[in-house]
Design a protein with these regions (language model features):
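ATP/pyrophosphate-binding catalytic subdomain of soluble kinases
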Residues: 194-259
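Short, surface-exposed beta-strand/loop "edge" segments at domain boundaries and coil↔beta transitions
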Residues: 56-59, 231-236, 279-287
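An N-terminal, globular interaction/scaffold subdomain
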Residues: 1-140
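Internal, hydrophobic cores of structured domains that mediate oligomerization or house catalytic pockets
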Residues: 109-210, 222-223, 227
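Gly/Ser/Thr-rich loops at beta-strand to alpha-helix junctions
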Residues: 54-57, 119-120, 144-147, 170-171, ...
Length: 348
């Protein structure tokens, strides 16, 4: 194995000229020992591009996608682009490796690009040139979407099959509006990690209407109270999970619902309790943090839904793996986004 590969696989970021990235990657894999001993497998199923603004976000994205690559091998391209920084365009390569089931190392490539000032405009064509052909592309936008520079976002999205965001970091409804426009006007399918976190709550809530006597009562849903823990109740992104849940209920019931929100300051972020008022019934879904379960209470009958045996908050890398392993796009998220935007305007 080449010295270049061993340096890259050890976690070292090897600096290269951005015009020679592909050539250097080819050199990294070119070694007699690879073919003769088959000790390392080069693997990729996705191109995953992470866009960041700060060094902290860059390091976070690198660590997260390194973990995700063990489950979904990928060519990782991490971009740090700051138009307000000094003009620069630099690049590095490294390798993410793990031990496969046969005991051999499975490795995928990571490319880091740092752009500042006017050279940020070179990022989209450079990224496009580095994508492995005939392989799906996911763009993970780390942090807040720059709604004031939507054209730059859409340029990066041109080759992307998926846009991955985490709306808990959005500071304005205009960020959600960008996601809606992506869903409506492009071939890129949006995926929101904040929406995926709600899956257990949606499953538990749907179980309320599983009993035969409850199946027709969804249409009688009149009032909903949603209680959630937030770290800062004034920050827009902290409210989106509750807004998503309310929008989903409205979409499923097909009726106007009176929704109230109870946001409580806590370090343990997320929904904690939902109360549903039906025509002649009441139901609650509640998180038990100590037991890590969601329980339902329908007119005094308490149960833990079979489909939600343990309620665990997933790590970001696990949520991203979930998106990459999903065979198709999420059809429900685009459906609820218009409702979410309406509710967001009402909460202002």
């Amino acid at each position: 194995m080449t010295d270049l590969f061993e340096r890259a696989a050890s976690g070292e970021e090897v600096r290269v000229d951005y015009t020679a990235i592909e050539r250097t990657l080819a050199d990294m894999w070119r070694a007699d020992g690879v073919d003769e001993q088959h000790t390392v497998t080069r693997a990729a199923l996705w191109n995953v591009v992470a866009h960041t603004l700060t060094p902290q976000h860059h390091a976070y994205a690198s660590e997260t996608l390194s973990k995700a690559a063990a489950a979904v091998p990928q060519r990782t391209i991490i971009v740090r682009a700051d138009p307000d920084a000094e003009a620069e365009l630099s690049s590095w390569i490294s390798a993410n490796c793990h031990i496969g089931g046969d005991g051999k190392r499975v490795c995928s490539e990571e490319i880091a690009i740092v752009a500042g000032g006017t050279r940020v405009t070179r990022v989209p064509p450079l990224v496009n040139a580095l994508l492995i052909p005939d392989m799906p592309v996911a763009l993970w936008w780390v942090g807040d979407l720059p709604h004031e520079n939507a054209e730059y976002v859409h340029t990066l999205l041109d080759p992307a099959d998926r846009l991955i965001v985490d709306s808990v970091h959005f500071n304005d409804p205009a960020d959600l509006a960008i996601v809606k426009r992506v869903a409506d006007d492009t071939g890129t399918a949006p995926a929101d990690l904040n929406w995926i976190r709600l899956e257990e709550w949606r499953t538990a809530t749907a179980s309320v209407f599983d009993p035969p006597e409850m199946r027709d009562k969804l249409r009688t849903l009149k009032r909903v109270q949603i209680a959630a823990n937030v770290q800062d109740e004034t920050y827009f992104g902290e409210r989106i999970e509750s807004l998503f849940f309310a929008s989903w209920l409205m979409a499923q019931s097909g009726a106007e619902i009176d929704v109230t929100f109870d946001l409580r300051r806590s370090d343990r972020r997320g929904l904690i309790r939902v109360e549903l008022e039906l025509a002649d019934s009441k139901a609650t879904i509640e998180r038990d943090h100590d037991r890590c379960v969601l329980s339902t209470n329908i007119d005094g009958r308490i149960s833990v839904p079979d489909a939600v045996t343990r309620s665990q908050l997933k790590n970001i890398d696990e949520l991203i793996v979930r998106v990459l392993k999903q065979p198709g796009s999420d059809r429900l998220l685009p459906k609820i986004l218009p409702v979410t935007l309406q509710l967001a305007q009402q909460m202002k």
